[in-house]
Amino acid sequence: AIELRKIMSAGQLVSDDILNKIVFDKLANCKSGFILDGYPRTLEQSSFLNNFLTKLSLNLHFIFNIDIDFETLKMRIHKRSLEENRDDDNAEVVETRFNAYINTTKKVSDYYKNNQPTIFYEINGNNEIEKITSKIIKILEK
């Protein structure tokens, strides 16, 4: 846990092997459902997740991609940094993570958008938090 915190505080992505193990350990006991936030972030993690779910005879029901522009993201994280004391809430880390998203995670989003379009939902993350939450709840209630 300490090693993970160091990696995340530097704005780096945790390795696929470590994250896949964590997900495997947690999902193996989640027979009634689960929510993944920030995973998968790479195509390799996506492949692992797909294979893992197939082995457990589980399916994804919803995939949300909350798309937000960099300026709005910086503003929200700055606000969060005033309310919470997180090591990873600084401008350098935010920029590193945003670049990682552009370079790796967007490929995962595109993969699911193209391969599972019936469960993939693009959400405008520039809207107010309440509006984003309301949109997600409406989709879940369908």
Residue ranges of each PLM-predicted region?
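A glycine- and Lys/Arg-enriched "phosphate-lid" helix/loop adjacent to the NTP-binding pocket
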Residues: 3-8, 53-105
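ATP-dependent small-molecule kinase phosphotransfer cores
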Residues: 1-51, 83, 92
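Small-molecule kinase domains that catalyze NTP-dependent phosphoryl transfer to phosphate-bearing small molecules
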Residues: 14, 18-27, 86-132
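Residue-level signal for alpha-helix termini/capping positions
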Residues: 27-28, 54, 113, 141
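Small/polar loops that bind or transfer phosphate-bearing groups
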Residues: 15, 37-38, 64-66, 124-125
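C-terminal alpha-helix
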Residues: 135-142
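Short, well-ordered secondary-structure micro-motifs
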Residues: 46-47, 74-77, 133
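Conserved nucleotide-binding/hydrolysis micro-motifs of P-loop NTPases
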Residues: 40-44, 67-74, 128-129
